């Protein structure tokens, strides 16, 4: 038997991402965002959803670009801390000893400790209610060499210990149990 619950956003898990924004060092900020995802494959597009009252909101709106920095188990404390502290009061890079790096295609910094940094340029902002959705083109992706398979060049997801968010908690991803299309693959 299933129970009826009030409507809610129960789509979990989600990436526990650190989104970076700002066009100069004085305005650089990090915001923890779980409302982040893929919108389109071709052209590659992502979104983040941010409350308008957040410190990063006007910075995002002014510069119209950001970097989605995926996080790891080792970054869990910093990920949570950056979500409960305001950039008005703290330099989050300094406080969490995270290293701002130069992105290739946007002015916003990336986080050097992140295994995967997705550089985005905003196309549209959609006011939805509690959050506004920043719809963006992916203009570059930086992947840490230590997580790339030396033979295939593919990103080794399992070895990166990516962090995810689910219903108020942080979790690391588990083991791979299949791959896309494995259910219809012909047996050899």
Give the label of every model feature segment.
Residues 1-188:
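Basic, polyanion-binding surface patches
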């Amino acid at each position: 038997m299933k129970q009826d619950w009030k409507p809610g956003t129960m789509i979990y898990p989600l990436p526990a991402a650190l989104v970076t924004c700002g066009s100069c060092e004085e305005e650089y900020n990090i915001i923890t965002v779980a409302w982040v995802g893929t919108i389109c494959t071709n052209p590659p597009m992502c979104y983040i959803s941010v409350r308008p009252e957040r410190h990063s909101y006007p910075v995002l709106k002014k510069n119209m670009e950001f970097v989605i920095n995926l996080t790891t188990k080792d970054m869990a404390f910093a990920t949570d801390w950056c979500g409960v502290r305001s950039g008005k009061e703290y330099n989050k890079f300094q406080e969490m000893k995270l290293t701002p790096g130069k992105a290739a295609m946007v002015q916003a910094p990336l986080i050097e400790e992140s295994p995967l940094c997705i550089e985005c340029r905003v196309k549209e902002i959609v006011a939805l209610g509690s959050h506004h959705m920043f719809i963006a083109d992916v203009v570059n992706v930086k992947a840490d060499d230590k997580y790339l398979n030396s033979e295939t060049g593919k990103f080794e997801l399992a070895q990166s210990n990516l962090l995810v968010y689910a219903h108020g908690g942080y979790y690391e991803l588990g083991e791979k149990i299949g791959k896309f299309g494995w259910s219809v693959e012909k047996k050899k």
